[in-house]
Design a protein with these regions (language model features):
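Glycine/proline-enriched, intrinsically flexible loops and inter-domain linkers
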Residues: 1-182
């Protein structure tokens, strides 16, 4: 759950007050589980656009990085405390018409400092059939980025947007229009 993923940052924040040189900084904490669905009717989608579209519903586990550790950089694209890493692009593309146009480390997203936090990632995803699809977002760290400690800067805040330029909400079901990318 999101609470279970975020709780360690609260505990570490308390411990940092007593042992600042022995506690890691905040990390992304929450999982960015990309839930995509297509080929079925959704509010705000013209059923005509769905003719011939493959019906699918997939979930890919994704995450940013952990906070800087005492004496070390944080781990890139690794969640703490679960240790979940990312689902391989090939699995998502095999199970559905989803196409990953980009999946790469997000430069400088870990927060500068003597030891930086682990890097997050940039992903660009589309429906390969050029049909609309839905993203069910449950993404944290968009408004409040992971805070740096010991003089380190905060990490980069998350962002959810369409290639066409529209910004999406971090929570809730939203339409990715036909031909666009998230």
């Amino acid at each position: 759950s999101t609470i279970g993923q975020m709780l360690p940052d609260i505990v570490f924040g308390c411990l940092h007050q007593a042992r600042p040189d022995q506690v890691p900084a905040e990390g992304t904490s929450s999982l960015w589980n990309v839930r995509l669905a297509g080929g079925q009717t959704f509010k705000g989608v013209d059923p005509e656009q769905l003719k011939g579209a493959t019906r699918f519903n997939v979930v890919g586990f994704n995450t940013g990085g952990t906070g800087a550790r005492p004496g070390k950089d944080g781990l890139s694209v690794t969640s703490f405390p679960s240790g979940i890493r990312n689902v391989a692009v090939e699995i998502m593309e095999t199970l559905s018409p989803v196409v990953y146009w980009k999946k790469e480390y997000r430069p400088d997203s870990g927060g500068a400092g003597e030891h930086r936090g682990g890097l997050g990632q940039i992903m660009e995803i589309a429906n390969g059939e050029s049909a609309p699809m839905i993203i069910s977002a449950t993404f944290d760290r968009i408004v409040h980025a992971a805070r740096g400690t010991g003089g380190g800067l905060s990490g980069g805040a998350g962002r959810l947007s369409l290639k066409s330029g529209a910004t999406l909400r971090g929570f809730g079901r939203q339409v990715i229009p036909a031909g666009d990318r998230v």
